Amino acid sequence: QRQMCIRDSSYGKDRKAVIDEGKCVGCGRCIGHCNFDAIRNNNFDAGELLNRKMAEYTKAVLAGRPGFHINMVIDIIPSCDCCPTNDAPNRPDIGMFASFDPVALDEACVDACNRQQPLPDSQLADNMAAEGFCDHHDHFTNNSPETDWRTCLEHAEKIGVGTRRYELVRVR
């Protein structure tokens, strides 16, 4: 069984999931680990606020500068790569994507990931096979319901960083 929290801040008590706010650092691993949406972070706005701020900082960094963006969609792991521990990749390597528009680029990468089947024995495959699983038709949400990637791209598009519309051109 996978460890639910690296800081032991989430645990079961009286058959209910509990988060010890004193130990919690807000990484969201417990939320991603829970297949049944039984754990909710008290600061439920934090992820949405972070996503909006990332879009705003991106706009500031790119303002008045030319940009060409490259994403390598490989080793797609369940949690952010900033987490000190993680699980095996949950989707096959997809490839390299590039664009002058960072929003279109990220949207294309998300769509490509969602078209893939989860790798067998991955955290995502385990989540989706669990009894009572609620399919959100989005692998990122299925893996970590508390993490909503859409808010970042929606806000980035709204403030003029780019557009979520794209045309995929394969280069071999």
Question: What are these model-derived regions, one by one?
Answer:
Residues 3, 7-172:
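Extended, low-polarity segments enriched in aliphatic/aromatic residues
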